[in-house]
Amino acid sequence: MNRLFSPILTGLVLLITAYPFAWMFLSSFKTNREIYQPGKMLPESFDPFAYKLLFSGELFDFTAVLVRSLLLAGGQAIFACLVTAATGFALAKGRFRGKTLLFWAALLIILYPKQAMSLALFEWMARLEITGNLYGLMLSGVASGLGVIFFTQVFRKVPDELIDLAKVEGQSPFFCFFTLLPLIFPALCTYGILHFFLCWQEHLLPLLTLRTDQLTLPLALAKLGDSSYHTPEAVGLAAGVLAMIPLFLLFGYFFRRVRTALADWVVS
């Protein structure tokens, strides 16, 4: 009975999960009349007018928006992995006063809403004169309480004998950290993907810090939803479809690494 019930339940969950994405993709070829017609799944014709309008440059340079978002999310994810992994390594293997206090401070940062810190981050960036460019926005998100706690737990599972062996050989803690990075590569992939997803959909801080000609994807999607533009609904849906493609490709490429990290986390 369980062998029969499990595939049916799995298929039902997959169908429910995939339906919104399938509807959004098919609706990107529809007219407004077809979109608002109840029960209509397939378009009358697969006319890619919405995609042509996006890449025509009449609304904004969508290619530049896509590349800008990729650079921002990818760069911030890489630097966030390095910074939070180094902090987690220090908290897990270092011996200094205040280590426990720093760990609990990282936990409190997770509980504090990021939206409430946006104005403080903007003021900090303004004083450093790094507003209005991607590098300043990238720098503002590299420190994460979630990443610190995650990598602290990851490095606690690394045997202390490896650290002691490196010390016997006269290696510095900095060198030890980079030596251990290949051992935690699945964890790096997992957190990197998570941080990429979070940065990919960040809206408030880019809205505060970037110029109007430096749109990221969330800002571009919000601009398409502005009623003053009078764009067809299919254009916004087409932009949403294109915005999801990098996420699917990234997760599909690193899926095995993520699964390995999650399995190790559950076992431990």
Put a short name on every predicted segment.
Residues 1-268:
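A hydrophobic, multi-pass inner-membrane permease signature
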